[in-house]
Structures are given as C-alpha cells and as structure tokens.
C-alpha cells in the first residue's frame, strides 16, 4: 500500500492536537492528548498513534511547536556565551534605552547571557566595510575555551558592522567551529546580515540560547518516530507561517519562536477564504493562552520584528499576533489591590484545572465554565479524564474567589468568565479597531 497520510501536530502548553488527512480518500481524523511538558515528543507520538494506528502510511508530519516559545518565556534555554568586538559586550543590556517599567524610577533586566560569558576580542570592521583590525585566531580559541570551562553549551559570534563585511566573522567562525564540541554555534551575519547592532546581537544570541533545547527535542522526536520503524518527512512550522526541515530548525530555532500560533493563523486564513471571507480576526484559545491575529484582504499581517518578552527582541519575519494569558487553564486569583484577575499563570495539563483532581486547588477558567454548566463533566475532551470533578471545581471557586469577594459560587464563576472575556475583547480591539480596521 502506498504512503498516503499527512499528519498535522500542534503541541500547546496544555493539549497536543493531531489531524490526520488521507490524501486518496479525503478522510480526516482528529485526536487530542495532554501535552507532556517534561518531554513533548512523548505526547507528540501518543497523539499520532491515537489518530492513526499505522505509521507506515504516514508520508509527512507538519509540526507546530512551542518548545522555543516556552524556553524564551520561562528562560529555560541553554547556558550561552557571546564572543564580540572589544567594547560591545554590553549591547544586550543597553538595548534601545528602554525600560521594563516606563514610568518607574528604575527597573531591572537580566539578559539571557550572563556578563561573564560575554567575551571581547580585538577586531574591527568599519561601517564602510573596510577592516581596520583583523582577528587573532589565538584570541578566538582562548575565548572558546573559557566559555566551555564556564559550562556554556552554545555560543554566539557577533562582530560590530559585520553586515557591511562579514570577513572577520567568517574567519572567526571557522576557528570557533573547529573547537566547539557541538553544532550549537550561531553567527550573527548568517542569521541577520543587516544594520542595527542590538537587533542583530539579540536575534543571534537568542538563536544560540534556543539551539540546544530545540535540537535536543527534535532529535528525541526523530528517534521516537524511527523506533516505530518509520521514516516520515517532518516539517516544522516557522513564525511566518511557512515550513522548514528539521535540520534547518535545529540550526535556526529562532524562526520557530511563534511556530504553533502561526500555524493556527494560516489555517484560519485558508478556512475563511474557502468560506468566502476576506477580512477576519482569528482567535486561538488554548489551555495556557489566547492568541489573536488580524487577516485583511485574505492576507496575514506580517512584522519583521517582535519582542517575545522585555529585552528579547527578535528580528525575523513572523505573523503579527497578540497573546494574552486567558486560556482554559489560566488561574483566577485576587490581586494585591483586591481585584479579580485572570492569568498569566496557568495550571497547564499537569496538574491542570481543579476539576482534574490532580492536586491543583486554585480555580481556572475551565473550572468556572464547569460550575456554570457550560462543560459536560461526564464527557470531557482530551482523553486525560473520563469525567471531571464538579465538586473540586466548585470548592476552588468558593475558597479562592467567592468567599474573598463575598459572592455566591455561581456569581464568582460568572465573574471569572466576564474578566476573561474582557481581556480577550480588549486584545481584539487592540489589533483591529485601534488600528483603524
């Protein structure tokens, strides 16, 4: 029998969703399984085996991943070093003279690369591309050895004005790659060969920061699939909505910073086009976040630069979207001013909402919906639970919200939903009405 199934996999913070499309018959099947945060490749394969029990028929797997997104937001990337031009080790800290709190007297920011691991060498390329000072290969070797001794598993090479003439970076890269024990070497001019030193340094440094976790994840993924005695082509969704090979994703993980949400926007555009709608707003509400994007005249809104978090500037083409912490697993709480707030902390899939009965006693948006009867406790989706614990959800809403605000349990649950809806509608206004659409 010929290979004929194309698999789409979206790994989110709470659930992993799978769609299997049989090209010959047009038959579509879907599956949902809890994400395995400790190793996303485990939930990935479990989900595929739910959608189809014969991997020998799978020809292509298209994967939207949040590994890079989570590593950036949770600051769980690899220990990284930077080798740069003398005098420019603090480019990541100086940024563009912005501050975490615009109206505060002071603010703190810690770059993903520690200062002790940002090393300088004597080299200089001028703005016109002429080389004033050539590199000293021994100096590059010494810096590499120092970074390895400091425990760095990835390195970024960034020379000032490298975009005008990459010769010094190319020579230094050759030396660096001959010494570095793995492939986790990011060269700034290879990743972003254009003017603006902060954006180039930030993008290249974050690429290096992501290389080990993303590469390790993709290698585990390939291993798990090969263990099923099947060699399927795996394509990774990029932040701009396109796809790339696994090898490209390993070397340029920065392009996957918004991989999962971007895939959803592209799908929504195609569905809207087929239905005859050219202007739409997409909303992707998962367990952890709510992602929205605007599509005008059947075209995705693209941006060349985005901040994943303060100081984490990425300059690479990506679909423009806004993300807020208002997913099904977002935790409701009373803030320091006595007001009801939703997120950004999420219960995820483990322990999950209080109604999962796995140890979380704080109310989530899902718990509020269950209390209000909007979710059938006997038929939950996702396959993790045969039923949901209505009493646990009720108790969580009562203990953490209702009693503190002197409300009935029903009114407290209604308030949680209203706050979540207000946050979502505010984000929708931000990308549409406030931009003139």
List each language-model region with its residue ranges:
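N-terminally biased helix-coil "hinge/interface" segments that flank
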Residues: 1-437
